[in-house]
Amino acid sequence: MKAYELSIEEAAAKLRAGDISSVELTQSCLQRIGDVEDRVKGFITVDEEGALAQAKAADKALQNGETNPLCGIPMSIKDLLAVKDLPMTCGSKMLEKFIAPYNATIVDKLQGAGAVNLGKVTMDEFAMGSTSETCAFGVPQNPWKEGYVAGGSSGGSAVTVAAQECFFSIGTDTGGSIRQPAALCGVVGMKPTYGRVSRYGLTAFASSLDQAGPLCRTVADTALVMNSICGYDPMDSTSINQEVPDYTASLVEGVKGLRIGIPKEYFAKGLDSEVEKVVRNAIAVLASAGAEIVDVSLPHTEYCVAVYYLIAPAEASTNLSRYDGALYGYRDLESKTLEDMYKDTRSAGFGDEVKKRILIGTYALSSGYYDAYYKKASQVRTLIIEDFKNAYRSCDVLLSPVTPTPAWKLGAKSDDPLAIYLSDIMTVSANLAGIPGMSVPGGFTEDGLPVGIQLQGSHFQEEILLKVAYNLEKLLAIQPGKLDF
C-alpha cells in the first residue's frame, strides 16, 4: 500500500510510531497529484513549497509529543476559504489574482492541529452550481468515470479525496455542495449544523445557508476532522457557542433501538432505480442490525427547490455587489466612466451562471416584488423547518438518497439548468432548516458509479449521524471499485 492510500487513522498511527514522516506523506501526495491531476483536474493551486515547510514543522511537533491525529496529515481546501498568502479565486475570473491577506478560522484551526495544506481546489464559480462546470480554471472530472461530472460546488474537494491526492478536504455546503459531490465521487461528506463551524474567512454565497465541512474517505476520519474544526468563534456572528463533543467517542456503539425515518417524498417519481436499490439495501441492513424503521413525511419538500432558488440568489445578489472593480479583484481598464467600469467589470468578471443568479436575486428583492417572492419564500422556509421538527418527534435520523441519479456526463445538462437545479431537491432542505446532513458511500451502479446515502439529523446531532454512518460503513462492507489510474 502506498502512503497516499492510507486513511487518516492509519497515517496518524504510523506518524506517531515513527514509521513514516509527514514529509514523506506529503511527498507521496504531491507525487500522486503530479501523476493524476491531468485526469481529474482537482486543484487550482498546488503549494508544494508551503506544504513541505508545513510538513517539516509537523514532524518537529510530533517529535515533541504532539498527539493531535491531524498533525502531519495532508489536506486540500476549497478555493473560497482564505489561506494567507495563497490565491483565493472562488473559481471566478473576478478574483483571479486575489491573494488572501489572512486565514479563515477553520484554516487556523487545522493549521493549529498540524494539518498540511497542499493547495486550493476547483469549485463552481462562487459556489453556484451542482457540477463544478462553472469553474473558470478547469472542470474537475469524476475519478470513477472519465468525462462524468464530479458534482458541486465542492467538486474539487470530492475529487482530490476520491483520487487519493490528499487525505481530506474542506468544502462548503449551501444547498448540497458537500454532500452531492461526496455522493457522486464515493467519499464521505459532512455538512454540520449551521453555526457549528466558523464561517469567518469563507467567501459568502448565501449567508444564511453556507456552512463549511469535511470530505474524507472514511467516517472515522470525518469524526477526527470534525473534532478539530467545530467550535465557537467570536469573529463569526452566526457562530453558536455550544459544547463540542468528541465525535469519535460513540462511533462504535450500535444502532439497535435507533429510529431511522424514511421520508416518503424523497422516493418519488424521478428517482433512478439503481440509486433506490442501493438506498433500500442500506435501510434493510440497518433494520437487520436492530434499528427501527419509521415512515415519515416532509410535506413541503416539493417547494424546497423553488424556495432555495429564491432565497440563495437574493442573498448572493447582495453579497456579490461588492465585486465592482473599485477595491480588489478584476477591473476593466478600458472603461471611460465609473459607471462603465462597474458594468464592464461585472460583465466580464462574472460567468453566466453567477450573472443569472444575481439577476434572479435582484429581481426577487426589488420594490414591488419583495413580498411576492422573497418574503413568501422565507415564510415557506419556516414551514420546511417545522416539517423537520415534526419528523424528529418520531425518529432520530432521516435516511434518503442524496441525489436522484448517479453522476452524468459532463455537459449533458448544460442546456437544461432546471434539470441541474432539481438534482438538489433532496439536499437544499437541510440548508434551509440549518440542520446537519451527510453523505456516506452506499454502493455502486452497474456502470461503476458511486451512490451515496444521505443522513440528516436535528440541530447539533452530528454525533448520531456519524454513529449511524459508521455502522452503515461497517455493515455494508462495500468493496470499492478500482480507479483506472
Curated annotation (Swiss-Prot):
Instruction: Quote any Pfam family the record assigns.
Output: Amidase
- Give the enzyme class: ligase
- Which SUPFAM superfamilies does UniProt cross-reference here? Amidase signature (AS) enzymes (SSF75304)
Active site, UniProt feature: 78, 153, 177
Query: Which N-terminal stretch is annotated as signal sequence?
Result: none
Q: Which UniProt keywords apply?
A: ATP-binding, Ligase, Nucleotide-binding, Protein biosynthesis
GO CC entries? glutamyl-tRNA(Gln) amidotransferase complex
Its EC number(s): 6.3.5.7
Where on the tree of life does the source sit, at the highest rank? Bacteria
Alphabetical list of InterPro entries matching this protein: Amidase, Amidase_CS, Amidase_dom, AS_sf, GatA
Listed PROSITE patterns: AMIDASES
Q: Name one GO biological process term.
A: translation
GO molecular function annotation: ATP binding; glutaminyl-tRNA synthase (glutamine-hydrolyzing) activity
Name the chemical reaction catalysed here: L-glutamyl-tRNA(Gln) + L-glutamine + ATP + H2O = L-glutaminyl-tRNA(Gln) + L-glutamate + ADP + phosphate + H(+)
Q: What does this protein do?
A: Allows the formation of correctly charged Gln-tRNA(Gln) through the transamidation of misacylated Glu-tRNA(Gln) in organisms which lack glutaminyl-tRNA synthetase. The reaction takes place in the presence of glutamine and ATP through an activated gamma-phospho-Glu-tRNA(Gln).
Oligomer status and interactors: Heterotrimer of A, B and C subunits.
Similarity comment: Belongs to the amidase family. GatA subfamily.
Question: Which PANTHER family does this UniProt record tie to the protein?
Answer: GLUTAMYL-TRNA(GLN) AMIDOTRANSFERASE SUBUNIT A, TRANSAMIDASE
Q: What is this protein's name? A: Glutamyl-tRNA(Gln) amidotransferase subunit A
Taxonomy-wise, where does this protein's organism fall, top ranks first? Bacteria, Pseudomonadati, Thermodesulfobacteriota, Desulfobulbia, Desulfobulbales
